[in-house]
Amino acid sequence: MRILLSNYDGVHAPGIQTLAKALREFADVQVVAPDRNRSGASNSLTLESSLRTFTFENGDIAVQMGTPTDCVYLGVNALMRPRPDIVVSGINAGPNLGDDVIYSGTVAAAMEGRHLGFPALAVSLDGHKHYDTAAAVTCSILRALCKEPLRTGRILNINVQDLPLDQIKGIRVTRCGTRHPADQVIPQQDPRGNTLYWIGPPGGKCDAGPGTDFAAVDEGYVSITPLHVDLTAHSAQDVVSDWLNSVGVGTQW
């Protein structure tokens, strides 16, 4: 198995290095990751400037000022030859649950892999300690995929509780929960008296009930949420069409 491995928090982050070491026990792994933390980059792609890369002695590649999406795009289309069989993103330091997936660079890297036609996993640890647990879970899933491919055409968003492996209760297939809207902005002043603004923390849990990714992780399970790129709200199409007809939009300007 040939794996393109990326992340959002940089080529030297403990999560990606722990996972790369574990994956190399049974797979051909090419790391292509940002040279620095690009948290919250989501699906941004660098289009107005060129990108430089640096290759380390062990073969890992850092993309200077690159986003996670840049890294996967370059990895698939230029830097990994032959091309990968699968794209893996992580291990993220902190969870990507509920609405987090909208902003997540970790999920975005996996999404770019899927957009380019490859199976893709996004892996996050709900903490900063037991990266080995998340790595073991990921390796188990990838070994299973080697034996029997999963042909859903979906991204698997994997969240692992920050526990020793023997304390993980199992795996649950989940849906995304939701958070309350974030509303905190933290103002500060620079030495010249100018006001600076920091984006505050995410909103608290809103829908974290049974079946959600929040609930699974809180209860000590691995959460696997299938995600897809198509954002169409199919169930709303007829509602919108009927509304347009009723108000006359499209027939009178």
UniProtKB/Swiss-Prot annotation:
Its EC number is 3.1.3.5, 3.1.3.6, 3.6.1.11. It is found in: Cytoplasm. Its cofactor is a divalent metal cation. GO terms for cellular component: cytoplasm. GO terms for molecular function: 3'-nucleotidase activity; 5'-nucleotidase activity; exopolyphosphatase activity; metal ion binding; nucleotide binding. SUPFAM superfamilies: SurE-like. Binds 1 divalent metal cation per subunit. InterPro entries: SurE, SurE-like_Pase/nucleotidase, SurE-like_sf. It catalyses: a ribonucleoside 5'-phosphate + H2O = a ribonucleoside + phosphate; a ribonucleoside 3'-phosphate + H2O = a ribonucleoside + phosphate; [phosphate](n) + H2O = [phosphate](n-1) + phosphate + H(+). A divalent metal cation binds at D9, S39, N92. Keywords: Cytoplasm, Hydrolase, Metal-binding, Nucleotide-binding. Belongs to the SurE nucleotidase family. NCBIfam families: PRK00346.1-1, PRK00346.1-3, PRK00346.1-4, surE. Nucleotidase with a broad substrate specificity as it can dephosphorylate various ribo- and deoxyribonucleoside 5'-monophosphates and ribonucleoside 3'-monophosphates with highest affinity to 3'-AMP. Also hydrolyzes polyphosphate (exopolyphosphatase activity) with the preference for short-chain-length substrates (P20-25). Might be involved in the regulation of dNTP and NTP pools, and in the turnover of 3'-mononucleotides produced by numerous intracellular RNases (T1, T2, and F) during the degradation of various RNAs. This is 5'/3'-nucleotidase SurE. The lineage of its organism: Bacteria, Pseudomonadati, Pseudomonadota, Gammaproteobacteria, Enterobacterales. The gene is surE.
